[in-house]
Amino acid sequence: MFLLLVSPLSLFAKHTDLNKAVLKKLDDIISKKETYQIQREKEITDLKVQLAHSTDPVRKYELYASLFGAYLHYQADSALHYINREMEILPQLNRPELENEIIINRATAMGVMGMYIEAMEQLAKINPKELNEWTLLSYYQTYRACYGWLADYT
C-alpha cells in the first residue's frame, strides 16, 4: 500500500523536474529574443540585397520564396507581398505548375493574417487532381490549418 502512494509521488516529482527544465530552457530562449530578431533581420536584409542585384527571373523567384518564408510568421503582410511578386514573375519562368504553389502560399499567409475566408477562397481556385504529391500535401495541410484557425476563432 505504501508503494502505491509513493510511486505516483515519485513520478510527479520527475515530471516537475522536467517541467522546470523545460521552463528554464524557454526562459533562456525568450531572454535571447533580441538576438534572434537581429539574426532574422540580417537574413531578410541579405536576401533583399541579393534580390536587388539579381536579374535572372529564376533566381528572383527563389529569393521571393525565401523572403516569403522569412516573413511568414514574422510580418505576414510582407510575406503576402513577396507571394504576389512571385505571381508577377511567373510568366517569365514558363512553369505554370508553380501557380498552384503560389496560391497555396498566398492562402497560408492570409490564414496567418486572420483572413480565413479569403484563404479558403484562394484554395477553392485549385483543382487538387492537378497537383503533384508534394503540392497536394501542402494543399491539404493549408486547408486543415485554415479550418483549425476558423474553429479557434469561432
Whereabouts are the PLM-identified features?
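A "functional boundary" signal
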Residues: 2-4, 10-154
